[in-house]
UniProtKB/Swiss-Prot annotation:
MF terms (GO), sorted A to Z: rRNA binding; structural constituent of ribosome; tRNA binding
Keywords recorded for this protein, A-Z: Ribonucleoprotein, Ribosomal protein, RNA-binding, rRNA-binding, tRNA-binding
Source species, domain of life: Bacteria
Protein name: Small ribosomal subunit protein uS7
Any one annotated GO CC term: small ribosomal subunit
Keyword rRNA-binding tagged: yes
HAMAP family assigned to the protein according to its UniProt record, in alphabetical order: Ribosomal_uS7_B
Membrane-crossing residue ranges in chain numbering: none
Species this protein is from: Ehrlichia chaffeensis (strain ATCC CRL-10679 / Arkansas)
Amino acid sequence: MSRRRRATKRVISPDSKYNSVLLARFINVIMRSGERSIAEKIVYGALSKAESRLGESAMSIFSAALNNVMPQMEVRSRRIGGVTYQVPVEVKEDRAVSLALRWIFKAAAAARKRSNKMYMDCLCNELLEAYNKRGGAYKMREEKYKMAEANKAFSHFRFN
């Protein structure tokens, strides 16, 4: 038994422009060294570019892209009888959102390294790709699903 107390979840205040907690979490993922204003400029700029390209509202694009990237299943390592199995488990809502935000950020950062574009443009492209069920973040989700499908035989070792 752990002697520590369970860490309490911090309440994140919604962002100033769209009044969304999810967008505030995304800004926190992108933020480096506490430079919130720079992260906000990047996110709001990418969303406004996506909005002008598609003609839909920025929040609907962001939420649709997030829903397309959020995983429902993942594999967890479970050691039983000296053998480690990759056991497929369902992903909790909060973890699914965190993974989706992180994957969109990583895919945009990888695209930034490959090309000479600004990060704002790469983030806009990645959001549009996720919106259309393509791109690096969606690929990461599909890899999780493939792993879960391949290890379906070990699903009876689920965590209690």
